[in-house]
Amino acid sequence: RWAEIVCRSPSCNECCEWHTCFAPED
């Protein structure tokens, strides 16, 4: 599934510096 994580996380794609984005979680 896709989990909403903080953009600062290395798992996240390029996105806003302070907002959240969706990234695949293992």
Curated annotation (Swiss-Prot):
Species assigned in the record: Enterobacter agglomerans
Reported function: Probably involved in molybdenum processing.
Protein name per Swiss-Prot or TrEMBL: Protein NifQ
Record family assignment: Belongs to the NifQ family.
Domain of life: Bacteria
Biological process terms in GO annotation: nitrogen fixation
UniProt keyword list: Molybdenum, Nitrogen fixation, Plasmid
Organism ancestry: Bacteria, Pseudomonadati, Pseudomonadota, Gammaproteobacteria, Enterobacterales
